[in-house]
Amino acid sequence: MSEKKIYGPDVYKRNEHGLLENVDYEFNEDGSVNWRAMIKEEFLYPNKDWFASRKKDVPTSVEGLSDKQLLIMLGGIKELAKMRGYHTIDFKVDNISDGYVTAKCQIDWIENYESSFGGISSRYTDVANATLANTDNFCAKFLETIACNRAFVRCVRNYL
């Protein structure tokens, strides 16, 4: 007998602990979710700069690499945020000067067993920038977007 396929709202149905019912979570020894282990391999790739700085060949696979040898695609961070669950994500962008943009990302996370505050969601904020000095020529046209993406990634990564 095959398992019933989950559709629509059931994909995001949560249990009494705030965890998605259809996800097999990995946990740390202290009982917290091992969010790093929850990132699918399809969202990981070798950190070319790490290998170049050590004059090593960049591997073609992420298998066996340590966290410092890996980078996570934006899609992996987005998936983690959806898995963790949030109420809102808000951005505030400031064009400080020509070629210098800052972004603040604020996420109101849903309550779960890791952050139980009596029915109150937890809020986390982080900031990032994008400048002509820390992006390439192509990206210079998208400083606001890059700053927002960086702030979002920091917000998710540093909260989890």
Regions found by a protein language model. Name each.
Residues 1-160:
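Glycine-rich anion-binding surface patch
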